[in-house]
Amino acid sequence: IDEKFDDISTLKMINDAVFSDFDNDGDQDLIVVGEWMPVTFFENKDNKFYQKKIKGVSNINGWFQTITASDLDEDGSVDYIIGNWGKNNKFHPTKEKPLHIYADYFDDNSSFDIALSKVSKTGDLLPIRGKECSTQQTPFLGDKVKTFKEFATSTMPEIYGSKKLEKASHFE
């Protein structure tokens, strides 16, 4: 399709999309799903796609994997099934306490590194992975944080450095 889109810079890691006439005006609109992003709707107006916010859906980020369009209840309107990781994972993110991922070349080599973190009950940003796993991926951490106890009682900015975290791509 060589139609034009308005700003798509907010899209993150797209996993699936479906063309469907969600506004019932006779042309094919686009719905996009992905990780670290809300279900994103693009309304087709005169062969140009404009992002449209849908109340109750457009403000919820998820780990969306799939979308399917079908008239499931046979009432003449299109229904959508959206597959999301949901709560069946070891991280258990919530709207109040989301999972945070920082991604960058933390040890300045050619290998892209990720750091998983969550907010503690006291409001500190803490690593999810332990010292052993973290230092396997980013060896400089072994020199910076010497003991398991020190790692266990340190925050993400203390471990990785505030400047490195600010520079990194951040998903929540």
Where are these regions (language model features)?
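Beta-propeller blade termini
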Residues: 13-22, 64-74, 83, 103-104
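Hydrophobic beta-strand segments that make up the repeating blades of beta-propeller
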Residues: 29-34, 80-84
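Acidic carboxylate motifs that coordinate Ca2+ or other divalent cations, activating on Asp/Glu
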Residues: 25, 29, 75, 79, ...
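Structural signal for beta-propeller blades
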Residues: 38-41
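Blade-edge motifs of beta-propeller repeat domains
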Residues: 1-12, 43-62, 102-172
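Short, solvent-exposed loop/turn segments at the edges of secondary structure
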Residues: 12, 36, 62-64, 96
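Short consensus segments that form the blades of beta-propeller domains
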Residues: 32, 58, 89-95, 167-171
